[in-house]
Amino acid sequence: MPFPWLAGQRITAERLMESAPVYIQKTALQSRTSTVTPTADPDLRITLDPGTYDIELELGYSGTAGSGGVRTSWSVDAGITAISGIRFTRGTGQDATTRNSDASRHTGNGLSTEAIYGLTTGSGQRGWGSERWRALVTAPGEIRFQWAQKTSHADGSWVAPESFLKVTRTG
């Protein structure tokens, strides 16, 4: 949805910049071991002012035969809700062993409901997942992407530096 403009409205540089997408890129490969409890990613988070936003995540990840991939969810501050209460996820399914697997996920989940992406071929091969949702922000607050291993194991699961968050204000 385009940012709302009204006939005769004065358009300023500040007003134009309000609707420009903001990109937040993961800064380095990050590994987590021996955990299935999603915790906030140190990079993939942003503080939002009141308004309506499209939130898009592109996730590069990997796992091993032991760790199996990643599980994801979101945490948000009070005053932030998902419009329609769900996020849409797509990528390799939790039973996938390679990124070329026919096992895929295309689902709607609540923000705190874990989505599981499988991949067991190690860090040399990365899987790709996408998540999208629309946020209604009534009070300033932060949204945080969270992740952990699919299966707790000493072998790590990774989120890659090509992962990014795109946030676009739509209202």
Q: What name fits each language-model region?
A:
Residues 1-38, 84, 169-171:
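Glycine-rich, low-complexity segments
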Residues 5, 66-68, 139:
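Short loop/turn segments at connectors of secondary-structure elements within structured domains
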Residues 28-40, 61-63, 117-127:
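Extracellular beta-rich ligand/substrate-recognition surface
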Residues 42-45:
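Short surface loop/edge beta-strand patches of beta-sandwich-type extracellular domains
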Residues 49-51:
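A glycine-anchored, Pro-Gly-centered beta-turn/N-cap motif
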Residues 53-61, 145-147:
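A short beta-strand element within beta-rich, extracytoplasmic domains
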Residues 64-132, 160-161, 168-171:
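Terminal beta-strand-rich extracellular "head" domains
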Residues 77, 138-171:
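C-terminal interaction-tip segments
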